[in-house]
Amino acid sequence: VLAGTIENLRVQTQNRLFSDLNQQGTLWWRPLQHLSKTVDISQKAQSLHFDAESRERYFTVCLKNSTRLRKLIQWAQADKNKQRQMRILVIDDEADQAGINTCNIDAEEVSRINKLIRALVNGKNEDGKDIESTYLAMNYVGYTATPYANILNEPPEKGSLYPRSFITTLAVSKEY
């Protein structure tokens, strides 16, 4: 989960997810914190079980800042064999905050954080270059109540987080 720019809110989101995901069921969700190439051995990809038969699942809540995103990408790509086993769902909480491309689109510039999110989602290294290994699956879901910046700042182009058909309007619930 990509969650904002404030650490105490990141921790709050992680704790809420841990509590909500670990209800009754056969899966156990384990939080991984501040992932990087130098993380504790128990959180390195080589120590984790990504096979479909494993009852253990993993999640991390990462701040949308360039250092954390760069380290997350490096962690995910540190072990090529494990990377090929990873099924990743990136959930961009408040996708209109910090992650949108705020650079001049006519100059084909990309903001640093948007470039790193694109690299993660599109299977590139932290410099945006192709890598030798790919993930088993990669999906990106960005949600926000106000998607105007996402629509207007980033036209659908190669590598964009938002293809032409990225918006889905949800039906109004009966409780509304």
Language-model features, listed with the residues they occupy:
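Short His-Asn-centered micro-motif
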Residues: 2-4, 61-64, 92, 143-144
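Conserved nucleotide-binding/hydrolysis micro-motifs of P-loop NTPases
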Residues: 6-9, 66-68, 96-97, 146-150, ...
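A short acidic (Asp/Glu
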Residues: 9-18, 69-74, 98-104, 150-155
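Amphipathic alpha-helical scaffolding segments
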Residues: 15-21, 77-78, 87-90, 160-163
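Conserved RecA-like helicase motor-core motifs
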Residues: 22-42
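Conserved P-loop NTPase catalytic core
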Residues: 86-92, 101-176
